[in-house]
A protein has these predicted regions:
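Short, charged, intrinsically disordered terminal tails
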Residues: 2, 137-144
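Long, contiguous secondary-structure blocks with strong helical propensity
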Residues: 2, 56-75
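Short amphipathic alpha-helical segments with heptad-repeat character
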Residues: 10, 14, 18, 59, ...
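Charged, amphipathic alpha-helical coiled-coil/dimerization segments
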Residues: 21, 70-136
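DNA-binding alpha-helical recognition surfaces that contact promoter or target DNA
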Residues: 42, 67, 130
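N-terminal helix-turn-helix DNA-binding core of bacterial DNA-binding proteins
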Residues: 22-64, 143-144
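N-terminal leader segment of winged-helix/HTH proteins
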Residues: 1-31
């Protein structure tokens, strides 16, 4: 048996992430959402934000946010509202239906996460997160 390499570890991370993403995506589709749209709803959960703020928070282009909002707005989950003092700015508001869908979709995503790491105890989960954060640092990102 050959010794494990860094490439083996990266392959395992990629495979695990891929499987979790597929399973999470399937669970979210039952709620009519994608992982990206769930992240957007979560970004609005703490209060109204501008399109620019959401774009920056999610690290996606303003055009992508516009497309995402169009879909979520069509389903009544998000509303565009004028800024009270700056008419050039559009605020995004999570509707009551959006809040309801956020709760259901978040619960579904949490079930997937719990199943994915359910074989690990709390200490192992902490170690896993710490290791992934250390791996992400050279890439200039955070695991959280």
């Amino acid at each position: 048996m050959r010794p494990a390499t860094g490439s083996d570890a990266v392959d395992a991370i990629i495979y695990a992430a891929h499987r979790i993403r597929i399973t999470t995506g399937a669970a979210l589709r039952e709620h009519g959402l994608s992982l990206s749209s769930l992240k957007l709803l979560r970004a609005l959960a703490d209060g109204d934000r501008s399109m620019r703020e959401v774009s920056q928070a999610l690290h996606v282009s303003p055009r992508t946010i516009t497309d995402m909002i169009d879909g979520l707005e069509a389903h009544g989950l998000v509303a565009r509202c004028p800024h009270p003092s700056d008419r050039r700015v559009t605020r995004l508001h999570l509707t009551q239906a959006g809040t309801h869908e956020l709760v259901g979709a978040s619960t579904a995503a949490e079930r997937v996460a719990a199943a994915a790491i359910g074989a690990l105890d709390q200490a192992e989960q902490h170690v896993l997160r710490s290791l992934l954060e250390r791996v992400c640092v050279p890439a200039g990102e955070s695991a959280g």
